[in-house]
Structures are given as C-alpha cells and as structure tokens.
C-alpha cells in the first residue's frame, strides 16, 4: 500500500497524522475501501461515480489516516484547486467588464467564489493542512510549502492570458495581485504557504525560500505577484534568505572560483570580444539558474524595502571581507560573495541604485580597501579582469547623487599620495593602481558608449533612427559640471586630465547643453594662461562634434551675467580671459588663435549686451568689459544707431569713472574703445566728441580737471533763506506783474540779501595740481586722437603734431557752446558792436564765471583753435568772455595787472587762442605778451582794439581757404581791407610808445608783415 501511495524516491512519511476532532480512526477494512475508492473514483459500497467533492474528501480522509499517501493526495488536490480557480474565472467572465479590476462589480451572489460545491472543500483542505503544520512543522512545512508554492506558480502560468479578466503579467502586478487574492483557492494556497514560512522562520526557512526561488525561476513573470505579496509580509526574512540561497546556488554553478561572469572554465575558452559588455556575454539564467529569480524578487521589494536590501547587501560584502583572502581556499560562499554581488548589480539597475548611495561611505575607510585588496589577491588574473570589467560597467550605470561621489572617491583613491587632499587616507599602492586602471578603462568605455550611441552604422538607414543609448553615469553628472570644472582647474596631476576628458565626453553626450556650460565655467574661473589653455583644449576637442559651441557658450555666460547668477569676480575673470584670447588672435599667436577669432566674432554679435557691463557697479567687471571691447572686432556691417550710441555712452562713462578711480594710467582701455568708435562713422565721431566734452564739463567731473565744485551750495542757500527776514529778490517778485526775464537787472545784481550782507562763500573742492594736469592731458590726448585727420602727420613743420579734422573740431566747438551757454546755441557768428554787450551782461557774466570755475574750457578752446576755422563756431563764448574781461579791467583800480592774476591769464589765453585760430592777424595776436607789463586800463584799451577788429573782420568760416600743400584751412588777412590791423594796430603802437622804456624790445613783434612775408607764409 505504501508503494501505491508514495512515488518512487519520495521521502518517508513524516509521522502519524495529528489527533483531531474528526471521524474515529478507520479499521484496516475501511481504510482499504477508502484507498480503493480514491484510486478508482467509484464508491465501493454503492458503486456510483464519486463527485469531485466526495473524491476530494476521500483524499483528505486518507491524508489524515494514511500519511504515506500524502503525495498522491496532494497531487489530486491540485485538480481540486484548479477546478476552483477555473470556476472563479468563469464566473468573472460572465460579469460585464466595466473599467479596471478595482472598479468592476463583484460577482453575482448566487455564484460561489470557489465554484459550486468546492468552496467548503477548499476550506477543509486548509484546515487539514494547517493542523499538520501546527502539529509537526519541521516535517510538514517544507512539503506543504513546496506543494502550495508550486501549485500557485502552475495556476498563475496556466490561466495567464486565457481569460479576459486576467491581465498580462508585464506591468500589471497590482491588478494581478488583486485578482488572485480575490480568488478563494489561490488565497488559501497563499495562506498555507505563509503559515509554513511563519512556522519555520525562527529555525530553518531555507526550504521554503528555496521552493519560492525555484518556482519563481520556472513561472516568472506570472509568479511575481506571489513574490511581491510574500516579500511584503516577510521583508527581512525573504531578503536575507533569498540572497543566501542565491549565493549558495551561485557557488554550486561556478560562482566560487568562477569569478564574476564565468561558468567553470568555459569563460576562459570563449572570451568575450567586448571588454565592457552592456550585459553579460552569457545569459545569467543559463549560468546560474536562481540568480534571475533573486534579481526579480529583490527588484519587486526594492521600491518599499530598499533600506533593508541595502543593509543586507553591505552586510554580505563586509562579512566576505572579514573572512580573509579569497581564492581557491577557504569558505566558497565568502569567496563568491564579491562576484555574486557584482553579477546582481549588473543584472538589476534597481539594486545598483539602491546600493550606490552608500557605496562610497562603505569603501572610504582605508581598512576596507586593504581588506578588499587582500581578499582579491588569491583570484586568478583572468577572474580579476572579469570583475574589473563588471566594475567598469557598473560605474557607467551608476545614477543619482551617488554617481558624482563615486567618481570623486575613485579619483581621490587613484591620485598619488603626495597630492591626496583627504587627510589620513593611506591607500596601498596596489589599490591605487587598480583605481587608476579602473578610471582609464571607465573613460574608454564611456567614449565607446558616447560615440556609438546610435547603434551600428547601418542601423536606421531604411527606417527611423534608433533612440540614443542612455548612459546613467553621464546623466547623473550633468548637474555637476561646475564642480568638475573647478576640480579640473586645480591642475593636479592625473586628476585634471581625467576630469578634462570626462568633461569632453559629457559635452558630446548631452549636446548642446553641457558643452557651452563647461566652456563657460572654464573661461570664468581660469586665473592663469595654463588654466585658460584647458578651455582652448576643450574647444579643440569639441569643435568637430559640436557646431556653434562658442556662440552658445557666450550667450549662456552673458545670460548668467545679466541674470545675476554669475558672481562679479567670475564675470570679471570671464571678460578678461576673453580679452586675452582675442588679443592672442590679433597678435598672430599659435594655439588658441582660432578660438580667439571665433570669440571675437561672438562678442561682436553681442555688443549691445556687453555695453551695459561698462556701467557695472563692480569696478573689476567694468574694467574687464572695457578691456574686451577695446580689442573686440566690430561687425562688418555698420553699427545701428542704438548700438553705437549705447556703446559711446557706456564708454564715456567708463572713461571718467576710470579717470576718477585710477587716474590716467587706468583709462587706456576706455580711450582705445572710444577712439575705435569714433572711427566707425561720422555719427560715431560726433557722438564721442559731444559726450566727452559734455561729460568733462558736467558738475560731477569738473573737479577732475581743476574745476570748482559747490559742495554745499544748495544747503547754504537754504539756511541763508531761512534766516533772512527780508529778501530783495522775493520782494521784487511780489511787486512785479511778471517774472523778470533773463536780461533784467534783478537777475544781475544778486550778491547778497539786504539786511544780511553778502552771500556765504562757496565751499570749493580741489584736487592736486599735478593730478589735474595729468587728467587734463589724458582727456585732450583722447580728443586729439579722435579728431585726428586720416592722413596723420604729413607736415614736417608740425613737429609730429597730428592734423586735426576741421569737422571734428567744429563738433567740439558746437558742444562747448551748448554746454556753457545753451540759450546762445545757434546764434549768429558775426561780431556785434560794443553797444550790443549791454544787452547781454548777464550772459557774459555767466560765461566768464564758467571759464573761471572750469579751466578746462581754455584747453578745449586751444584744441578747437588748432583746426581752423572751427573756432569761428565759438564766437558766442569768445564775445562773452571778452566782454566780461573788459568789464573787469574797466572797473579795476589797481596800478598793475598782477593784482588780478586770473583775469590776466584769461586775457592772455583768449588773445592767444584767437590768434591760433586765425581770428586775429599776427601783429594783434602777439599783444598778450605785454599784458603783464601794462596797467589795467591799457589792457582794456588793447582788448577794445581786439573787439573792434573782430567787429570789422568777423570770425566767419567763409574767410578761410583750404591750402592743399599744408592740408589745412588758412586765412589771408592781406586780402581783407585793413586785415593787417590798421587803426587797431595803432592803439597797440601807442601803448608801446608810452611804455617804451619797458616794452621797446617787443616793438618788432607788433609790426604788420610785408607782402613778401605773407607770400612765404602762404606757401
């Protein structure tokens, strides 16, 4: 009978059935009848065919009474559960399908969940098996767990895809779990297995876990819902036991000693041609049967129990290192742990992502690296190479924040000991060399992946191109481009070479995003030519792969600058490096010349974005922008008016700011920029000259050129007004019907307030005289460069002095008039009679006061006078200043002119300027040489003669003719009636005769030239 019940090779009976409250024990005759009924399916007494329900209960009776019949009974019960599942699915098929499973209506109440007549049988089976497990778990739990788990696998595979209510296993794990747990039969099997595992969890759960792994391998992926449910119920046990069973099976199938990726000795006979495979060359399911199941189970649990999986994997790793060196001796499981973990990580990106976050912390202690090195010493060279290849592949698949940390760890470990920055990191040389080799192989592997992302060359020719292959390691580094660039610029040996190469690969992989960003970081952080050369090398390596790299980098950096995300020191460094590159190109340097040329083109296309940087509040940024724009090539087409005016305004502002902060040595860049802008077009020249003159005469800049600044003028006026009890000006305004005009007497005599005395004295700020001279010379030098005629210096008599353009000088003259006396701008150039000065007293006083407060006006008049006939356009200023001086000398009661030093100097300068500008003949133009020797009334007489001459011979441009030999306009006074002086020269001679004792030697200077002399001067 035992032979009939137990299959060949089956284990012996686990023992007598437990005592229950069911039927009394059967006699031998009754037991024989039950066996016959079970085997034939016919009732031995009544002779009719047993129903499925009766047949199942007959088997349960035998299972209680005859333990050796368990194999046959359990096999028969498979059919019972199969019929119950079929009935359940048939009932679901009859129900209308509406929406997803969790929204579908329940089956009709008249249809039992387990099929007609089988629900109670399934419940009885669960009760019987539960009693067996509780009575003798060590004997029954392994058998029943294997039976239940295998039956669930068969049912899952059998009915997958055969019914419309059973979703496909791929991507429908939650729906499958809900469907099968809603079936009474499969839920009962799950409860039975959970009871078995609970009974053995404290002693030896390996049998249950082995059965789970075997079934998972055989019926995956239809069986995944079982694994997910059991793993969620027993995460700690399942994770540890699944890994333990997988490791044991890995050892049996060649893992211990076979290394990572070899099966016994087969790997050495057929080596893989690709040293860095995307997946193992031989399918892992064929080499190690259970490892695929381990990967699947842990993959399901990784989302909710990632911490437990990570702790268990790291525990296995540390335990293997603590067991001593690897190789052919020692515990096989310890020897195979590292290859096993590598293989798991290769097959499951989810597991790799789970561990990669703490992998660096796990390997950082020097003792761990030393133990790992000792552990791997006993492995053959071929197996070590295989594991190294797997490690390279795993690093390339690392993702998330752990990828950058892993890279830093590898680089720090591979660096020579003298350059390691981490304190206390003592790494053996063998470990250092291994990391060095790992990094080199990693870079080679990444290069292959990046440059072969689209598959084989012929792939996609006839159809759509294949999607690019993803490289998780490079994807994770996209957010660390700035850190990589900073590490590269440290120029530590080996490190910067590795990271520079990695930046190139990352730029090609993520094009076009990371390439411009990396180039921008290098340009904004490089502090020396050596560091700057890294940017040129990166560009040289990417120029073939990335088109438009430099314009993109330039635009991205400018966008960061204007958005305020690039700090001012980095902005200044970026602009200085650009200027250096463009300068190299203009000097014809080798190497980065092409880079400088391209950057020059990019900069010229963004002049409107660079111009505001000249106004940057940070001085170093503004100065760097000026250095770049000073040598940046302008576009081939003409600048638009808006671009030109924006550049000129910013350049002029930069000039005065540099002059204030750094003095003349700091304005070189601004001067060069403004000179180039003045040469772009006539409009540019006029704008530069106009803004320079206006800026120099502005109240905020007058003190740079020796001007007087009313520091507290407004404050003092307010105080004075508040203290005054009576104001003559206010009184007159109240008693007049209208506000007095600019020519009235009320606006002339305002030296003080009646009852309060004179106005408070002005608070004057002044600079050092030498500094004023330097500043003035810098401004005049810039104006001369801008006004210089294209021909340069062609006259030997000019002693190298540049020939100024009359049109440019005219622009300066017009700007002077508009700045000093705006209400007289555009006035007639003809000189009015002396009586006319009575109507312009206020204007003349204002002009005289401006000349006294701003000595720069005299220098600007000299500049204008050097390019006749431009001084004619300053006629209003000359009349006003001359009238103011006449009034002063008329009112002066001093015996000599030395008591009025400023007026004396102003008178001399005025006459000399008019002579230089050919407004006076030479005889009259030399009279200023004797002013210091005369009395004030005599100076007034001479100035009146000047006024009279100008009244008769007005300063009109039409009186000048162009002399091609000298390349300038001249005025021939001999052709004008009385142009040599005439009666006006007689006044000068009379003064000379009166002071012949002191001025006799000057008489030759005031003689009208002969016609022959004029002829020689004309030629």
Curated annotation (Swiss-Prot):
Domain of life where this protein originates: Eukaryota
Claim: Mitochondrion is one of the keywords in the record: no
Residue stretches spanning the membrane: 534-554, 856-876, 930-950
Keywords: Acetylation, Cytoplasm, Membrane, Nucleus, Phosphoprotein, Transmembrane, Transmembrane helix
Region (Disordered): 1-26, 261-283
Pfam families: INTS5_C, INTS5_N
Record-given protein name: Integrator complex subunit 5
Organismal lineage: Eukaryota, Metazoa, Chordata, Craniata, Vertebrata
Gene: INTS5
């Amino acid at each position: 009978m035992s032979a009939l019940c137990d299959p060949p090779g089956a284990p012996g009976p686990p023992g007598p059935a437990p005592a229950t409250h069911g039927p009394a024990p059967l006699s031998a005759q009754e037991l024989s009848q039950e066996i016959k009924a079970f085997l034939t399916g016919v009732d031995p007494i009544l002779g009719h065919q047993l129903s499925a329900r009766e047949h199942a209960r007959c088997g349960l009776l035998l299972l209680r009474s005859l333990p050796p019949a368990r194999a046959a009974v359990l096999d028969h019960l498979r059919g019972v559960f199969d019929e119950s599942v079929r009935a359940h699915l048939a009932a679901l098929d009859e129900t209308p399908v509406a929406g997803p499973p969790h929204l579908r209506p329940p089956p009709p109440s008249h249809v039992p969940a387990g099929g007609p007549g089988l629900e109670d049988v399934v419940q009885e089976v669960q009760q019987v098996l539960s009693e067996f497990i509780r009575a003798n778990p060590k004997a029954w739990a392994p058998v029943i767990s294997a039976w239940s788990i295998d039956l669930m696998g068969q049912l899952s595979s059998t009915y997958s895809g055969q019914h419309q209510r059973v979703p496909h296993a791929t991507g429908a794990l939650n729906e499958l779990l809900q469907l099968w747990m809603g079936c009474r039969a499969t839920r009962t099997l799950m409860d039975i297995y959970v009871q078995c595992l609970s009974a053995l969890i404290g002693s030896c759960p390996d049998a249950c876990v082995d059965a789970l792994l075997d079934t998972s391998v055989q019926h995956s992926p239809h069986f995944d819902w079982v694994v997910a449910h059991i793993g969620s119920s027993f995460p700690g046990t399942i994770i540890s036991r699944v890994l333990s069973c997988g490791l044991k099976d890995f050892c049996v199938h060649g893992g211990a000693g076979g290394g990572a990726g070899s099966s016994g000795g087969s790997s050495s006979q057929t080596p893989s041609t690709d040293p860095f495979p995307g997946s193992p060359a031989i399918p892992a399911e064929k080499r190690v049967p259970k490892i695929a199941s381990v990967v699947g189970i842990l993959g399901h649990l990784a989302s909710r129990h990632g911490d437990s999986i990570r702790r268990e994997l790291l525990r296995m790793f540390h335990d293997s290192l603590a067991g001593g060196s690897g190789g052919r001796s020692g515990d096989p499981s310890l020897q195979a742990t590292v290859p096993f973990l590598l293989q798991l990580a290769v097959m499951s990106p989810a597991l790799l992502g789970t561990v990669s976050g703490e992998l660096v912390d796990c390997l950082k202690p020097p003792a761990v690296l030393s133990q790992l090195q000792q552990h791997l010493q006993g492995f053959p060279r071929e197996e070590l190479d295989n594991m190294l290849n797997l490690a390279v592949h795993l690093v390339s698949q690392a993702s998330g924040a752990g990828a950058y940390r892993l890279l830093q760890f590898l680089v720090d470990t591979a660096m020579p000991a003298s350059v390691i920055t981490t304190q206390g990191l003592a790494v053996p040389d063998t470990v250092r060399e291994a990391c060095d080799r790992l990094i080199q192989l990693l870079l080679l592997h990444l290069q292959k992946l990046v440059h072969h992302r689209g598959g084989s060359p012929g792939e996609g020719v006839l159809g759509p191109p294949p999607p690019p292959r993803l490289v998780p390691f490079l994807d994770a580094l996209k957010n660390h481009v700035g850190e990589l660039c900073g590490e590269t610029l440290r120029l530590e040996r080996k490190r910067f070479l590795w990271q520079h190469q990695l930046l190139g690969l990352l730029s090609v992989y993520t094009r076009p995003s990371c390439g411009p960003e990396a180039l921008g970081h290098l340009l904004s952080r490089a502090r020396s030519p050596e560091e700057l050369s890294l940017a040129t090398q990166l560009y040289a390596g990417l120029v073939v792969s990335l088109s438009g790299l430099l314009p993109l980098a330039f635009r991205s950096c400018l966008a960061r600058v204007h958005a305020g995300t690039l700090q001012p020191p980095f902005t200044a460094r970026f602009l200085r490096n650009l200027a250096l590159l463009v300068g190299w190109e203009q000097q014809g340097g080798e190497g980065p010349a092409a880079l400088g040329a391209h950057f020059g083109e990019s900069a010229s296309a963004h002049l409107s974005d660079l111009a505001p940087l000249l106004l940057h509040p940070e001085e170093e940024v503004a100065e760097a922008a000026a250095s770049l724009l000073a040598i940046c090539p302008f576009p081939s087409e003409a600048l638009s008016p808006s671009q030109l005016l924006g550049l000129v305004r910013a350049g002029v502002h930069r000039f005065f700011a540099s002059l204030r902060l750094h003095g003349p040595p700091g304005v070189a860049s601004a001067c060069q920029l403004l000179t180039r802008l003045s040469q772009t077009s006539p409009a540019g020249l006029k704008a530069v000259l106009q803004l320079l003159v206006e800026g120099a005469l502005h109240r905020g800049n007058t003190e740079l050129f020796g001007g007087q600044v009313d520091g507290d003028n407004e404050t003092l006026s307010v105080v004075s007004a508040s203290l005054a009890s009576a104001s003559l000006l206010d009184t007159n305004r109240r008693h007049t019907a209208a506000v007095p005009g600019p020519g009235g007497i009320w606006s002339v005599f305002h030296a003080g307030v009646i009852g309060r005395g004179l106005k408070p004295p002005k608070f004057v700020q002044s600079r050092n005289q030498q500094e004023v001279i330097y500043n003035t010379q810098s401004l005049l030098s810039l104006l001369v460069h801008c006004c210089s005629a294209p021909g340069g210096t062609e006259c030997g008599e000019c002693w190298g002095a540049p020939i100024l353009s009359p049109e440019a000088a005219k622009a300066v003259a017009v700007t002077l008039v508009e700045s000093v006396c705006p209400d007289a701008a555009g006035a007639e150039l003809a000189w009015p009679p002396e009586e006319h000065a009575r109507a312009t007293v206020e204007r003349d006083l204002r002009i005289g006061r401006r000349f006294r407060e701003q000595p720069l006006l005299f220098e600007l008049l000299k500049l204008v006078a050097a390019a006749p006939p431009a001084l004619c356009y300053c006629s209003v200023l000359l009349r006003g200043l001359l009238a103011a001086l006449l009034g002063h000398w008329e009112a002066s009661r001093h015996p000599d002119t030395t008591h009025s030093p400023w007026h004396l100097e102003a008178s001399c300068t005025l006459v000399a300027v008019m002579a230089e500008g050919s407004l006076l003949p030479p005889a009259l133009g030399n009279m200023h040489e004797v002013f210091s020797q005369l009395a004030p009334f005599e100076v007034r007489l001479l100035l009146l003669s000047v006024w009279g001459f100008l009244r008769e011979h007005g300063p009109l441009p039409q009186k000048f003719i162009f002399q091609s030999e000298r390349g300038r306009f001249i005025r021939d006074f001999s052709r004008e009636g009385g142009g040599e002086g005439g009666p006006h020269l007689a006044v000068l001679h009379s003064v000379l005769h009166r002071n012949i004792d002191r001025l006799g030697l000057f008489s030759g200077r005031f003689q009208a030239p002969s016609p022959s002399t004029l002829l020689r001067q004309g030629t």
